[in-house]
């Protein structure tokens, strides 16, 4: 395994109110071990957006990086799909 491998996640922007920061909601699905039902888990991440190019509703890709603040450990890689409207 590569030493500097970093997590790359995809999710939807749910907030862009902060300067150069977006809040991204990442949803994952896992099978329950006993009941075999597919369960949805979601988690919010703060990500650095230097050019303020992502807006609410956009589908984005974020990558793990060094800590940029107390809660911000990801940065925006690209906007995959723009929100309609």
Swiss-Prot record:
Question: Which domain of life does the UniProt lineage start with?
Answer: Bacteria
Recorded GO CC terms:
cytosolic small ribosomal subunit
Under SUPFAM superfamilies, the record lists: Nucleic acid-binding proteins
Q: Which Pfam families match?
A: Ribosomal_S17 (PF00366)
Tell me which InterPro entries the record gives: NA-bd_OB-fold, Ribosomal_uS17, Ribosomal_uS17_bact/chlr, Ribosomal_uS17_CS
Q: Which residues form a coiled coil?
A: none
Q: Which UniProt keywords apply?
A: Ribonucleoprotein, Ribosomal protein, RNA-binding, rRNA-binding
Q: How does it assemble?
A: Part of the 30S ribosomal subunit.
Primary role: One of the primary rRNA binding proteins, it binds specifically to the 5'-end of 16S ribosomal RNA.
The protein's name is Small ribosomal subunit protein uS17
Q: What organism is the protein native to?
A: Spiroplasma citri
